[in-house]
Structure formats: C-alpha cells, structure tokens
C-alpha cells in the first residue's frame, strides 16, 4: 500500500512538473537586434570594442516593473528574468567569477552595474573566451574596466531604457 501511494505521489509531482514545462518554455524572449533602447547601444559598443568577449549581458529593473531582467545583450535573451546569481550581484554587490561548466572555453565575470554617480543599478555579465590556465584575475579587472567605462555613459537607471539614438 505504501509503495502504491509513494508511486502515485511521485507521479503527481512529476505530472505537475511536466505541466509547468510548457509555461516556462513559453517565456517570450526578445531579440537583441530589435532592442531599440540605450542599454542595447551600450552592449553593442562593448561587443564591438572587446573581441575577447563572447557574451555581454546588462541586467536591471525597468521603471514600473517588479521583476529584474536582462535588458540588453548580444544574445536573443532580452527580457529573461534574472536568476539568483544575477540578483545576488545587483542586490548584494557580489562578484561572480566562474568557468562555464558546459563549455570550458568560456569564463563568466558578473559585477554590479553602476550609473555615473556610482549607484548600483543592476548587474553586468561578461563572458570571456577562455583556455584552462588563463588569468581569471585579468578577466575580472577587464570586466570592472568595461563596467566603469559604460557607467560614465549612464546618468541614471532610467536612461538605460530611453530609445536608442
């Protein structure tokens, strides 16, 4: 009897997960090419001037929203909800240095994103080309330099969402 109940309970949980999968898969993410805001202009400039990067992602809370998302990137993931790592970087001012487990040729550095006054307004994730043994501290310094460079161009968080010129 216990085994039947255990199996039924397991199936109910499994069925619940399966039924949620289409809802999660239905999350509609925007294309970088269609993202006509200032933050995307900044992301495009960073990618054009840093050939050592594979990915750049800017994360912030859009005025009027309650959920923080990826607001600009070279990937078609615009609007992707921030995960707990993204939120830890922006809310707790943490820095993340991490090799990509699935692709050992990539190394991610995530740091808080600042505006020109130094206020934290989100996070920036920079994914570098990587070979085992590369200098991770150098990548961290490069990510900080990228962040500091674009911070000078951001008067406040609202500016990120203004139409691109």
Give each language-model segment a name.
Residues 104-112:
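A short beta-strand signature within small-molecule sensing/ligand-binding domains used
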Residues 122-123:
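Short glycine-/small-residue motifs
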Residues 44-65, 145, 156-160:
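Short N-terminal helix-loop-first-beta-strand/juxtamembrane motif that initiates sensory/input modules
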Residues 73-101, 141-145:
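Extracytoplasmic/periplasmic sensor domains and loops in membrane signaling proteins
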Residues 27-40, 128-165:
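Juxtadomain coupling helices with adjacent low-complexity linkers
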């Amino acid at each position: 009897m216990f085994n039947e109940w255990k199996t039924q309970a397991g199936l109910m949980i499994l069925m619940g997960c399966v039924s949620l999968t289409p809802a999660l898969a239905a999350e509609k993410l925007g294309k970088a090419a269609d993202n006509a805001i200032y933050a995307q202009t900044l992301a495009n400039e960073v990618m054009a001037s840093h050939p050592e990067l594979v990915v750049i992602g800017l994360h912030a809370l859009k005025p009027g929203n309650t959920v923080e998302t990826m607001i600009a990137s070279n990937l078609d993931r615009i609007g992707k909800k921030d995960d707990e790592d993204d939120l830890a970087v922006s809310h707790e001012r943490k820095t993340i240095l991490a090799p990509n487990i699935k692709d050992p040729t990539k190394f991610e550095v995530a740091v808080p994103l600042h505006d020109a006054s130094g206020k934290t307004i989100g996070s920036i994730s920079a994914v570098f080309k990587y070979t085992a043994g590369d200098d991770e501290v150098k990548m961290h310094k490069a990510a900080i330099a990228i962040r500091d460079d674009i911070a000078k161009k951001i008067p406040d968080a609202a500016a990120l969402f203004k139409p691109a010129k």
